[in-house]
Amino acid sequence: MPGKPKHLGVPNGRMVLAVSDGELTSTSGSQAQGEGRGSSLSIHSLPSGPSSPFSTDEQPVASWAQSFERLLQDPRGLAYFTEFLKKEFSAENVTFWQACERFQQIPASDTKQLAQEAHNIYHEFLSSQALSPVNIDRQAWLSEEVLAQPRPDMFRAQQLQIFNLMKFDSYARFVKSPLYQECLLAEAEGRPLREPGSSHLGSPDTARKKPKLKPGKSLPLGVEELGQLPLAEGRPLRKSFRREMPGGAVNSALRRESQGSLNSSASLDLGFLAFVSSKSESHRKSLGSGEGESESRPGKYCCVYLPDGTASLALARPGLTIRDMLAGICEKRGLSLPDIKVYLVGKEQKALVLDQDCTVLADQEVRLENRITFQLELVGLERVVRISAKPTKRLQEALQPILAKHGLSLDQVVLHRPGEKQLVDLENLVSSVASQTLVLDTLPDAKTREASSIPPCRSQGCLPRTQTKDSHLPPLSSSLSVEDASGSTGKRQTCDIEGLVELLNRVQSSGAHDQRGLLRKEDLVLPEFLQLPSQRPGSQEAPP
């Protein structure tokens, strides 16, 4: 006789969202002892991840979703993860990681075995002709010469990159894959897990058997027969697990920030975050619980890459600006929001406007770039400007735009701090003067050259007129040459330059006199047609 329909949901606390918050930590002193054995990535030194109210012996499959490190510590979980990577044609990543783990356990004194294993790992995964090459950055490439002096930790950097790639990219897809959902369902029903690579979970009869229900009965909400769902529709099965979690557990788990450094080829799966948000919202609507729905409804998230290389998740809540959304993250990380530029990943040409609504960044990735600001006091112009530049720029590069605006060059100015005579080297990085005030002085010869420079249009317009009035110009003396004819001294003659300036001013004045004539007080007489009748010459007052 069929009994009541069995609820297949996992009890509260047994399902943790697949957002790992484990942190790659260095090995402690006790772990690093003993002939260079062990590594910060050793499976014995991996962080345990978030604690669970249920032991891993009771619920081993559910514990796989708590952290990537806990998955690697379970041999069966590692086997299922390897099978998943085979379907994605990236099983060489976990194979390389396991090979590095075994390599680090070789004593440093056993140079023969180290050399043999290092040769095998290099030619199988890292060389240009490798049979199963792994995806690592150019900075982590190794040449074959390093095999001459093998060390237990010689592949640590490459192993770290592959570890981050699996943790932040492959692991997020594994915990929401149909393969993992089948394992969760089998564990919830008490069925034994199938061996990785086989076609069915447990007994084929139990795996394919459709639940028989009494008339008028139905399966619990969110639970359907897995075999009848297409591949893309297999995900709603997770809705039954999330339904029984406390209301704040979903939000708190989603707010966890990843503490490990991100590899350039690894990224957080934002599609999974959007799926969690949409499924949670639709599930609450189906339950018909209207109380507090607007307050507890989770929104979509934005992945924020920080300047130090780490990543964080920000809730794109409607009604908030991008500035408000990032204020909490910047305050927590000790960043000054006015000194931050925000760029969309892949579109770094133009920074985002922080006053627009943050919902435009839902399911998007943004990158924060820090800017160094300092105050620059222009003595000659009596102005104070605020300059913002990248930390990697030098002072001469940051000052170039303001100097070009005022027609100056780097050899015409000096930079120093207020009240100090010691000059600031323009080759220093901008980060060395962060939040400081600098004074920009111009050299005396720079001021002279700026005052003596005459626009070509003015000089060309007045020179032809002065050719007809040579009597007004004093003869040019031989002392007006800027440099000596022999070129031995090469020094500028300041007095001759001043004489040239006075001469050019007189040339301009002569040109104006030739055109308009000298304006005197006697010449300022109104024409007759503009004068009043009483002011006209020869006019008489009419008799009364």
Curated annotation (Swiss-Prot):
Start and end residues of each stretch annotated as Disordered: 19-59, 191-220, 449-493
PTM field: Phosphorylated by PKC. Phosphorylation is increased in presence of forskolin and may enhance the GDI activity on G(i) alpha subunit GNAI1.
Keyword Amino-acid biosynthesis included in the entry's annotation: no
Top-rank lineage group of the source organism: Eukaryota
Positions of post-translational Phosphoserine modification: 20, 42, 45, 143, 199, 203, 218, 286, 481
SUPFAM superfamilies per record: Regulator of G-protein signaling, RGS, Ubiquitin-like
Domain RGS: 67-184
One Gene Ontology term, aspect cellular component: cytoplasm
Domain GoLoco residues, every copy: 497-519
Reported tissue expression: Expressed in neurons of the V2 secondary visual cortex area (at protein level). Expressed at high levels in the brain cortex, hippocampus, striatum, thalamus and substantia nigra, in the lung, and spleen. Low expression has been found in heart, liver, skeletal muscle and testis.
Compartment(s): Nucleus; Nucleus, PML body; Cytoplasm; Membrane
UniProt entry keywords in alphabetical sequence: Cell cycle, Cell division, Cell membrane, Cell projection, Cytoplasm, Cytoskeleton, Developmental protein, GTPase activation, Membrane, Microtubule, Nucleus, Phosphoprotein, Repeat, Signal transduction inhibitor, Synapse
UniProt cross-references to InterPro entries, sorted A to Z: GoLoco_motif, RBD1_RGS14, RBD2_RGS14, RBD_dom, RGS, RGS10/12/14-like, RGS14_RGS, RGS_sf
Subunit structure: Interacts with GNAI1, GNAI2 and GNAI3. Interacts with GNAO1. Interacts (via RGS and GoLoco domains) with GNAI1; the interaction occurs in the centrosomes. Interaction with GNAI1 or GNAI3 (via active GTP- or inactive GDP-bound forms) prevents association of RGS14 with centrosomes or nuclear localization. Interacts with RABGEF1; the interactions is GTP-dependent. Interacts with RAP2A; the interactions is GTP-dependent and does not alter its function on G(i) alpha subunits either as GAP or as GDI. Associates with microtubules. Found in a complex with at least BRAF, HRAS, MAP2K1, MAPK3 and RGS14.
Task of the protein: Regulates G protein-coupled receptor signaling cascades. Inhibits signal transduction by increasing the GTPase activity of G protein alpha subunits, thereby driving them into their inactive GDP-bound form. Besides, modulates signal transduction via G protein alpha subunits by functioning as a GDP-dissociation inhibitor (GDI). Has GDI activity on G(i) alpha subunits GNAI1 and GNAI3, but not on GNAI2 and G(o)-alpha subunit GNAO1. Has GAP activity on GNAI0, GNAI2 and GNAI3. May act as a scaffold integrating G protein and Ras/Raf MAPkinase signaling pathways.
Protein name: Regulator of G-protein signaling 14
Organism name: Rattus norvegicus
